[in-house]
Swiss-Prot record:
This protein is one of the early assembly proteins of the 50S ribosomal subunit, although it is not seen to bind rRNA by itself. It is important during the early stages of 50S assembly. GO terms for biological process: negative regulation of translation; translation. It holds the Pfam family Ribosomal_L13. SUPFAM superfamilies: Ribosomal protein L13 (SSF52161). One of its GO terms (molecular function) is mRNA binding. HAMAP family: Ribosomal_uL13. GO terms for cellular component: cytosolic large ribosomal subunit. PROSITE patterns: RIBOSOMAL_L13. This is Large ribosomal subunit protein uL13.
Length: 151
């Protein structure tokens, strides 16, 4: 019986990708970023190993949603105290913390396990076009989340 070759975790060199979120659909952007973080785009993908890459998302404040989600999509958090439920809409959260919108969307598309939490730490989200990771020489990842639009 043949044994499936597993990639050696020490030899896996993660790459850095730069994704521009300006005028991109939130869900489709998050799905593409989650794929990069998990490493599913690689031929040596292994579900129980962290084979993913680092992803830098810029212009998080310019991400868009369709329909009435801007006013109807709700984000909830609880302080842990009685009556401590806080609810805000997509528009309110995007105005207050635009990075959080992208982070929550991507986190929901990663496995809810220890490995998923470790993969989530490889996501770096920034408001505006600037980021402090120039030393890693990130590759621009071409992304078009608008169906029918030219790239």
């Amino acid at each position: 019986m043949n044994k499936t070759p597993l990639p050696n975790p020490e030899t896996l060199a993660p790459r850095w990708y730069l994704v521009d979120a300006a005028n991109q659909r939130l869900g489709r952007l998050a799905a593409a970023v989650a794929t990069l973080l998990r490493g599913k785009h690689k031929p040596d993908f292994t579900p129980h190993l962290d084979t993913g890459d680092y992803v830098i998302v810029i212009n998080a404040e310019k991400v868009v949603v369709t329909g009435k989600k801007r006013t109807q999509k709700l984000y909830r958090r609880h302080s842990g105290r009685p009556g401590g439920m806080k609810v805000e809409t997509f528009a309110q959260l995007q105005a207050r913390l635009p990075e959080r919108v992208v982070e929550k969307a991507v986190k929901g598309m990663l496995p809810h396990t220890r490995l998923g939490r470790r993969q989530f730490t490889k996501l770096k989200v920034y408001v505006g076009p600037n980021h402090p990771h120039e030393a890693q020489q990130p590759q621009v990842y071409p992304l078009n989340t608008i169906p029918g639009a030219k790239a």
